[in-house]
A protein has these predicted regions:
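Generic detector of well-ordered alpha-helical packing
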Residues: 54, 87, 123-126, 217
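Rossmann-like AdoMet
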Residues: 1-116, 132, 276-285, 290, ...
Length: 337
């Protein structure tokens, strides 16, 4: 998954294959910018402050966010510097056209050691996963070999991988190993890269004022099952066919991600459905405001875009919002019970 996605983002325009929320409606980025501004105030207005985005795509979300911040929160705009976590030179070039003031980083660890507000939309789903299969109480780990899935018993995979699966999908001591053997085959996914990111970010947010907002897709609670998928030309595709020509993603384990951040010292809020989060932040009020000044067809398109982001049978329920923050920060906007 890591190599295939690296090749994909280096050679292809991913937005030819799928459309993300910032490309659907400008209101998405605007209200995320306002979320950051209000959260900055809740953190007692630290100066200077980093406004960072992990996996910023074309830079559309940040451009929309900065426009809204400049119009409504000039003191926050003056205090912030923009930082992108991006490993694709192709995407970095597109981001530079949208947000020329940005600074680029290969990882979270290379961000300046300053108070940080981090945004990540559809970032975690692209991080690599490991898959484990359990049959009759025995674990195997799934690999890709010669464009096919193959399995090796846990403990023998060290010949081809530096990261053995002896821990099992529980991540330490084999949490799932203590369960009774299932009556049928079960598949579990382990997201070590996401857990590492959560731990590093959680420690950063615990050490100084800061917050992070993640919008991505996956269940609220940890679950079993195969969530690996490939998207090519806007359609699902075989994840093993033509590596490097499709976007590979997997559902986010929000519960495990939040637990890793809390273990590092951060507070967490959510996850909650994206539709509820965006509605609380004024998605439809802002959309109606924009639609009033448009021709009827354009107004309908704006309203449909908002519905696409928030309706339960579209993106509103599968996609979730999760916030991490400094333990002393009050509840961030949108997460009030």
């Amino acid at each position: 998954m890591t190599r295939a996605n690296a090749a994909y983002y280096a050679r292809h325009d991913p937005f030819a294959d799928f459309t993300t929320a910032p490309e659907i409606s400008q209101v998405f980025g605007e209200i995320i910018g306002l979320w950051a501004a209000v959260t900055w105030k809740l953190l007692a207005r630290p100066r200077p402050v980093l406004l960072a985005e992990a996996g910023p795509g074309r830079g559309t979300l940040m451009a929309d966010a900065l426009r809204a911040i400049g119009q409504t929160a000039p003191s926050f705009r003056a205090a912030l510097s923009v930082h992108f976590i991006e490993t694709s030179p192709r995407l970095a070039a597109a981001q530079a056209a949208s947000v020329p003031e940005a600074n680029w980083h290969d990882s979270l660890e290379t961000l300046p050691n300053e108070p940080t507000l981090l945004i990540a939309n559809e970032f975690l789903d692209a991080l690599p996963i490991r898959q484990f299969v359990r049959r009759a109480g025995e674990w195997t780990e799934r690999y890709v070999q010669n464009d096919r899935f193959t399995e090796l018993p846990c403990g023998r995979e060290a010949r081809i991988s530096p990261s053995p699966c002896g821990r099992g999908p529980g991540g330490g001591g084999g949490r799932a190993e203590t369960r009774p053997p299932p009556a049928r085959e079960e598949l579990f996914e382990l997201r070590e890269s996401a857990q590492t990111f959560a731990g590093s970010l959680g420690a950063r947010l615990a050490a100084q004022p800061g917050a992070a907002l993640f919008l991505d897709y996956g269940p609220t609670e940890s679950s079993s099952g195969d969530s690996l998928q490939a998207i090519r030309d806007g359609r699902t595709a075989d994840p093993l066919a033509e590596p490097g020509t499709a976007d590979l993603t997997a559902h986010v384990d929000f519960a495990a991600f939040a637990a890793a951040a809390r273990a590092a010292g951060a507070a967490t809020h959510g996850p909650i459905p994206q539709g509820i989060f965006l509605t609380r932040l004024g998605l439809f009020q802002r959309t109606d405001q924009l639609a009033r000044n448009q021709h009827p067809a354009e107004a309908l398109a704006l309203i449909d875009a908002a519905n696409r982001l928030a309706e339960p049978n579209r993106m509103g329920w599968l996609f979730k919002a999760l916030a991490l923050c400094h333990p002393a920060c009050p509840t961030p906007p949108g997460f009030e019970s």
